[in-house]
């Protein structure tokens, strides 16, 4: 199969309007916009809102925080979300959804240099949200989670 499975797919951009979300954690507030290049991930995630979980510091990926989701399957009309607009190199403020497979399902948010990985090796996640306001506070969040442990994080539509 080689790299054929990694070739770009045709995107369904019927609704490319970006939705804004408020993300709160550790007393900090961030505003994120959905990414039109990940329509299936965005549509399925928006159905979960408001969404609260625990966020912890990454173990293998560098400067990032993640929401471990175990065997959870993000679904869109009963179909599990697969890979779309996926990357291993999130920029500061990028939020990725990893649908599982080699490692557990998760959401990862970069606050500094980050290469998305697990003990199994490099991973790629769907870039579905980008923080557009409050990005300068991400390092504060990351350091707090690193030194103080798991924190609540909430995603809600504005």
Name each region found by the language model:
Residues 24, 33-158:
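Glycine-rich active-site loops that engage anionic ligands at enzyme catalytic sites
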Residues 11-37:
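N-terminal intrinsically disordered, low-complexity, charge/repeat-rich segments that act as generic
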